[in-house]
Amino acid sequence: MELNHKWIQVIGIGDDGMASLTQALIKLVLNADLLVGGERHLAFFPQFQKDKIDIKGPLSTVVDRIKQEGLGKRVVVLASGDPNFFGIGPYLVKQFGSSEVEILPNLSSIQLVCARSNESWHDATWISLHGRSMTGLAQRVQAADKVLIVTDPMNTPSAIARYLLAYEMNEYEAFIGEHLGGPNEKTGWYTLEQLIDGTFAELNIVLLKRVHNVVSHYPLGVDDEQFSQRKPDRGLITKREIRVLSLAQLQLQPGHVLWDIGACTGSVSIEAILHTPLLRVYAIEKNADDLINLRENQVKFRTDFVAVNGRAPAGLDEFEDPNAVFIGGSGGELKELLQLCAQRLRAGGRIVVNAATIETLATAYETLRSLQFTVSVSLVQTARSKAILQLTRFEGMNPVYLVTGVQSENGDGDHGE
């Protein structure tokens, strides 16, 4: 192996320690002036008696220490498997520059778990729950037939199984790889039910594979009747035609944050996530009964997002700043609500208001203009066919004004017409 002479080498190491390294890499470690790694990795080299940094706490602290103690020296950083796969590699390259860092990977845990399970990994979705919340996992798993999950002591195989079963996702089986590549390696297939009470080593990888066919994709424009709704007031839902046009105006992208204010049944949030699974959604609904229906719909459509009972603008302080805001109901406080949303909206963001009355239209239009948004309005009048005996007629639906406000990339906008 030909090694470059960059002053920071990041070496991937397996669960079997030195046995996973070539002689050239072992020599590189032992000749370093400063050895950096987690306690477990440093313990693989008891013969190394020079300076060490134990990776604990924020990575920024580790970087500061490398700059202070390692400048002008040969620095080796030990990392699990492939340092570029949900590892420390990209962070160090970003902090020190590509010209200063060399990545020397080992077999990744993903490669090993797929080898042990005889599964390919080029067609899998990869998710890391290491140090992350499980919120949003349902829709990401739902969108894939095969999922590889990096876990942590909180997000264990058992916790993942309980989470998925709460969304009735029992069409998956799981392959668990523990201490892969090490002397204590253990692997096996499990049903999700079998995982619930299982105990697994802290070092593990979860492979989920869909083994039963279910409805995993919904076309744009889910029928209103598929959503649980409050009865007898079944009209309290953003109708399919209006929902689709509103989502088009929001122009959502993966990684965006959406606020759904006056969420009611959650139809807008749910359909947004179905077509943009990496969306992060925060919904608020003042009616507790509607929130019950919303949660039923979350389970049915396997969409996990934050939904709270409250009357906006109260409660919005707990939400991430949004890229887009949908307002389906304001409880008579639209002006104040729009002002707060404009303050929190990220540059270039959008606000879409569904207005059923001229008064709501006027308030939305004038307030957004006063806030320097570029404003446009669409009047949507639709009708659905309805059978009468052997004939068919159209039954008109209530007209809805779609008011769209767009903020410029520098936080302001031009007045609309």
Sequence positions of predicted segments:
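Conserved SAM-binding loop
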Residues: L294-R295
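Active-site capping/gating segments
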Residues: W189-V206, T360-A362, T367-G411
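A contiguous loop/helix-start segment that scaffolds small-molecule binding in enzyme catalytic cores
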Residues: E2-V10, T22-I26, R74-V75, K146-R234, ...
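Class I S-adenosyl-L-methionine
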Residues: M1-L104, Q111, L278-V281, E285-A288, ...
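Conserved SAM-binding loop of SAM-dependent methyltransferases across substrates and taxa
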Residues: T265-P277
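S-adenosylmethionine
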Residues: K286-N287, L291, A307-R384
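Class I SAM-dependent methyltransferase SAM-binding "motif I" and its flanking Rossmann-like core
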Residues: P83-A144, P313, L371-E395, Y401
